[in-house]
Structures are given as structure tokens and as C-alpha cells.
Amino acid sequence: MQRASSIPARFALSIFGRSNRVLLPAQVAKLKTLALLHASQLVTLAGPKRARVGKELSELAIIRDGGMLIRDGIIESVGLSGEIEKNARDAEIIDARDRVVLSGFVDAHTHLVFAGDRLDDFERRAKGESYEQIAAAGGGIWSTVEKTRAAKDVDLFAQAKRRADWFLKCGTTTVEAKSGYGLTVEDELKILRVIRRLNTETPIEFVPTFLGAHAIPEEFRSAPEQYVALVIHEMLPRVVEEQLAESCDIFCERGYFDIEQSRKILTAAKKLGLKLRMHVDQLTNSGGAKLAAELGATTADHLEKTDEQGIAAMKAAGVQPVLLPGSVYALGSTCYPRAREMIDAGLAVIVATDFNPGSSPTPSMAMVLSLACTQMKMSPAEALTASTINAAHSLTRGEKIGSLETGKLANFAIFDCEDYRELAYWFGVPQVHSVYVHGKRVF
């Protein structure tokens, strides 16, 4: 058997450094067969063929001294290393000794494509201004919209591709990505086309979501219903015609889109065949969780202000909650979603980064795991399930990613630790050793 060449030493540089170059699959020699052996913990997450609820969130199906046989980018078998090695005579060996191996993270809520940054907003928050105060003064979403509208396609793609590399270096292999910083027909399409291009020019799979109803643009402030009509009658048909999105999202919140406006837009999107995702109850308990249940949304995201009635409505309708503790942390708030109550109620909880320039500028799922444990009192196992297989099911990809099981894509990350709990425990430490997509090493 041939042994793969050694991989750079632990924690060589920051995950944002240039010591470990991200490679596209086409740049990596095709590996017909791989045998990953001797993982300290192979976190398979094998289990029900659906999103996990209740106690299932804690059942990781760990194999100690675990291994996988991978052929043509697909997991052929999973088990003890001794058994895997018997069938790996011609395989290239990946020695995962003293390391944790798990499915690549699945980030189910991001705003990846935008121009510039929000450093001024960050400094103003540090001085005590609220998110709403900053937005009212011309900052917030609108400042990013102006920069994104002004950016050329090529520049927008270059910035997004750089950020995509950050996700990969954090062990994330699938990313839901929203539009929402254009707020005109052509600028929203521009963002979604960038997301489509990212799918062809990076190793990550991006799942596109249309978020034209992210905010009322300045030019429609005095006539918000006209903008609602623009989204329904001009944006949505173009998005569907070009097959640029799988889902439609909306920011249902005070000062953005109210319940009735949200209902109109999402009903139109559903009629056009798009799945529904929603930003709800982030700043106020607006009844957004109940609307998500009424409309049969796939997910309801944020939920910081959701009450017991909202939780019950989501449970009854099978809506998956996507919890975003990174945005609570970055905004300096202490009002985290009621994760424990949602888990105890039987909801298939997800955690995600909410990566965006204003309220959660992090691509690190490990940081989110830490916040989920320390601030929302989820166990490390629950947080891990919520960031992999549950997230995959919310993107209708649970049958092919999110766990390490026979027949699934060989999308996985190897971490420089011996116990999966270290991912949440050592916050701020870059523990990603290597990342594989379709059985090819891409970092």
C-alpha cells in the first residue's frame, strides 16, 4: 500500500494565513481509492435517514480507531481500521492517527456575497450604539447595499471567492448562500450569478437562496408596497427563469417586512416552486415563527425572541429552527435563542454562522459550536449534529452529505484533536488539519 505524503504540522499559522493553499478538485490528482485509517474518533453520525431530534442529537455513532474506504469520491465502507485495511491493498492511505474525523460542516445560513466591510458599524457598536440606531443613521444593511451595487461582477466574485476559502479552512464543505445586498432586479441577479460561479470555481457546494426582501431600499422608503410588488412580479420570476435559487428568504422584522408583506412575498415564491426560509423574531417577537409554520417553511432562522407558542407552531408544522449565536455575540447581546426548549420540544435544531459583514463576520463553525455550548447550553454532541446532518437535511441534501455513511459523498474534515469535544472547547484555535471534498484533498 502507498502512504499519502505527510501533511503540514499542527497549527502552523492562522487559518487565514497562506501556509496551506486551497486547491480546486481539478488541481488535485484523482484518487481512485483512499483508505482513511486509525482515526482517534471517526464521528460517523450514522442514524435515521432524516433530521435528528431529541436524544438523537446526542447519538454520534463514533468509531474509535475508525476508518473509511473511499472509491471515486464515494464512501464505500466505514468501520474499524483493521477491517477497512483488509480491503485496501491498492489504496492510498490517509493516516488519521490521534485525530478526529467528521463530515464537513454544513453551514445552513450565510450572506457570503457582498462588497466591502462594516468596520465603521463595528466601531460604533463598540461605543454602545444599537443595530437599529446604526441602521437608522445610514449604516447597517444599506451601507453594504451601496457598495455591492457599485461593485463589478468580477470584483464581487473575487471577494466572495476569498471568503469561500475561509470556510473551507474552517472545515466547511457545503454552504447555503443568500443574495440580499442588491435590492434591485439586476443587482440581486448579479449576486446569485456570483454564487452560481462559486459552485463551478471552488470546491465548496453552495446552495443559493434568493433574499430580495432583505430590507426596503432607500428609493422605496416612502412606498414599501411598491418594493414588495417589485420582488413578487419582477425579481422572483427572473430568479426562477434563470434557475438561480432553490429557496426564497425574507427578513420578517419590525422596520423591514411585516407579517402581511412577508406572507405575500413567500406565497408568491412558493407558487413558483421555491422552498421557503425565513429570518424571524430576531429583534422582536413579531410572530414570524408562527408565519413560518403557517406557510410550511423549511426553516425559521434567528428566533432570539420566539416564545413558547412559536416553538409549538414550528413543531406542529415540522419547521427546522436555524439558530445563529454568532450574530447575538457579535451584536453584543445576551438574548440567545431558547435552544434547550426547542430540543426538548422535539425540533430538529440547526446551528449556523450567519456569516455577514454586519452582525456575524465569522466563517468558523467551531466558534459557533463553542457559543452553542456556552451560551445556549447545547451539549457538544448536539451542536455537532446541528451543524452537519440536521443542516444537510434542511438543504435537501441529507441523503448525500452530513454524515460518514456508505454511499455518501466523501466530504470530510480531519482535525488536530483526539476528542470531538475539543472543537468547541478550544475556541479560537485553528484545529483543521485537512479537508476532503468528493474524496479529494482541497486543503
What is each of the regions a protein language model found here?
Residues 29, 43-102:
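Histidine-rich, glycine-flanked metal-binding segment
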Residues 39, 68, 73, 98, ...:
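Divalent metal-coordination and catalytic microenvironments
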Residues 91-159:
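Metal-associated gating/positioning segment near the N- to mid-region
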Residues 139-161, 165-166, 173-286:
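Metal-coordinating catalytic core of metallo-dependent amide/deamination hydrolases
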Residues 275-276, 285-403, 415-421, 427-429, ...:
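Active-site-adjacent C-terminal substructures of enzyme catalytic domains
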